[in-house]
Amino acid sequence: MQSKLFILLFVASMIFHVRLSAQQDTTVTLKSKASSKALMKDTLDGKFDFSSFLIDAKGFIPVPFIITEPAVGGFGLAVVPMFLTPKKRPPGYKGYIAPDITAGFAMYTVNKSWALGGMRIGSIPAKGLKYRIGGGIADLNLSFYRDVTDKGEKEFAFSVKTVPLLFSLSKKITKQDVYFGLQYFFAKNKLTPLFVDSLPSSIQSDELESNVASLGTFVDWDRRDNFFTADKGARINVLYSANDNWTGSDFTYQKLSAALNLFIPVKKTWISGFRVESNFAFGDPPFYALPSLVLRGVPAVRFQGYTTALVETEQRFDLSLRWSAVAFAGLGKALEQDESFGEAETAYNFGGGFRYLIARAFRIRTGIDIAKGPDSFGWYIVFGHNWNR
């Protein structure tokens, strides 16, 4: 759950981690033609477009968000003031260079969940370094699901007060955009039951007020042609982390996660995307830190286990320069410690939506998805790609 909490806290920072290409000529043309009265129109087709505003605002983006995550009530509002600082290209450097991003974040939802946070995402291209620093505070009302003897699956609602901190640093180790890095995550957590029944046997009372702190190593290979809405390419990320007394954690456990995102241009107007992801927990993690399935239409932490695995596909069909239709579907399983793959319940999702090319110069698409899961519907406002985490 700790990764999901960080997604909720810093969703804007993640989705704005755009990789700006070397198209300086396009940027300059847009800026020279845009007038103060036409900042929201594209110079190419005269349609509504955010590109000139982003350029003329010198990197400042005051972004409002509607939160649609079912786990925190299905509706809420967030404000994300953000600054983007373009990087200078070192001599001989090829490929994309992401801007430095400094962002704040404030949110409130209908189930009285709230969060405040901030994050800095930056790089030193000449040294082949990338870094992330983030922190926040949150009070989230979340439901967890556990099997109870003779009663089947039951919902247990908690107020989750958490103060998370994150730091990561990675170094480019090959010419093929492979980065190796270290990541430290700390969270001070206090969970208060919002139910009158006793705790299930799978939840221990000493887990309700505790610290988790992990030190991890990761490898990241990213050859997508654009972070926001890739038309081709792939990304592979593998992370191993350990929680122990020496890291500052009250628990001893380890996690291993691996993810692949692949984008194939079947046609110029048809982009086929595939996602494969698996997570493993070893040792004795607290119940809220167990891996969970992340699928549209499935509330956060709805399916947890010591092992999770999922596959998902998303097909994008470009109907015109601006408008696209998307369709997606996925399957996943969350396995308990002594549960076989065949015994675990299968979670699924399917749905569709639309995208609008809202910033052509940056290839940013935004839209709405409607998804069906095993026992719920969900709708999501998407900025960039849903898999950007």
Describe the predicted segments one by one.
Residues 62-64, 102-106, 131-135, 180-182, ...:
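Membrane-embedded beta-strand positions of outer-membrane beta-barrel proteins
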Residues 1-27, 264:
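Bacterial Sec-dependent N-terminal signal peptides
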Residues 60, 77-79, 114-118, 161-167, ...:
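Hydrophobic, lipid-facing positions within transmembrane beta-strands of outer-membrane proteins
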Residues 104-105, 150-156, 199-206, 242-248, ...:
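Extracellular loop and loop/strand-boundary signature of outer-membrane beta-barrel proteins
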Residues 215-220, 224-321, 325-331, 335-336:
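C-terminal outer-membrane beta-barrel translocator/porin domains of Gram-negative envelope proteins
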Residues 19-53:
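Sec-dependent signal peptide cleavage junction
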Residues 53-62, 66-211, 363-365, 371-389:
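Gram-negative/organellar outer-membrane beta-barrel architecture
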